[in-house]
Swiss-Prot record:
Pathway: Amino-acid biosynthesis; L-histidine biosynthesis; L-histidine from 5-phospho-alpha-D-ribose 1-diphosphate: step 6/9. This is Imidazoleglycerol-phosphate dehydratase. Transmembrane segments: none annotated. It comes from Lactococcus lactis subsp. cremoris (strain MG1363). The lineage of its organism: Bacteria, Bacillati, Bacillota, Bacilli, Lactobacillales. One of its GO terms (molecular function) is imidazoleglycerol-phosphate dehydratase activity. The gene is hisB. One of its GO terms (cellular component) is cytoplasm. Gene3D superfamilies: Imidazole glycerol phosphate dehydratase, domain 1 (3.30.230.40). CDD domains: IGPD. It is an enzyme of class 4 (lyase). Keywords: Amino-acid biosynthesis, Cytoplasm, Histidine biosynthesis, Lyase. It is found in: Cytoplasm. It catalyses: D-erythro-1-(imidazol-4-yl)glycerol 3-phosphate = 3-(imidazol-4-yl)-2-oxopropyl phosphate + H2O.
């Protein structure tokens, strides 16, 4: 069973997350940020991960920006992915997927390499808010996820106008690429997918 559970409590956030990489796309998401809930639900559905997440942050009572919560959710999700993958024996390792989301086109390319890195090319400047979600936090979300999951992650917006569509394309393409990368390669069962013998 490729599963993981994390409880993360700081002075700013309280997070409980369970993850099953070999699920069916079911999710129960509650971050009190509607747009983030929507994106994480899409991530679960398109990756076939089962995700149960409850997250609360200092912004709920203070009126502060939910920056800490968004980043800590990504940290927790990244840690769970890394833990659930375990020794990574037999995984395909690489994933690549392009999503057309109406007028927007977004590609995710990733390598479960153990060498975390993020390349993020999407124009989300302008301090837009979507349901309490600061769109500029999207890059920070994926940086935290990549560095805690041990993933080399490239996210590229080829073009697009609608911010919601661009971000949705990013989450969906990431989900589909992850689904590819964590799947088992029947020709490499029981083997580390690296010529070095370690990831």
């Amino acid at each position: 069973m490729r599963t993981a559970t994390i409880t993360r409590e700081t002075k700013e956030t309280q997070i409980y997350l369970t993850l099953d990489l070999d699920g069916s796309g079911r999710s129960e998401i509650d971050t009190n940020i509607g747009f983030l809930d929507h994106m994480l639900t899409l991530l679960a559905f398109h990756s076939d991960f089962d995700i149960k997440l409850t997250a609360h942050g200092d912004h709920e009572n203070s009126g502060m920006d939910p920056h800490h919560l968004i980043e800590d959710v990504a940290i927790s999700l990244g840690k769970c992915i890394n833990e659930a993958l375990g020794d990574k024996l037999g995984i395909r390792r690489y994933g690549s997927f392009t999503i057309p989301m109406d007028e927007a086109l977004v590609t995710c390319d990733l390598d479960i390499s153990g060498r975390p890195y993020l390349v993020f090319n999407a124009d989300l400047s302008g301090n837009k808010k979507l349901g309490g979600y600061d769109t500029e936090m999207t890059e920070e979300f994926f940086r935290a996820l990549a560095f805690n999951a041990g993933i080399t992650l490239h996210l590229n917006e080829h073009y697009g106008k609608n911010t919601h569509h661009i971000i949705e394309g990013i989450f969906k393409s990431m989900a589909r690429a992850l689904k590819q990368a964590i799947s088992i390669d029947e020709t490499k069962v029981g083997k580390i997918p690296s010529s070095k013998g370690v990831l």
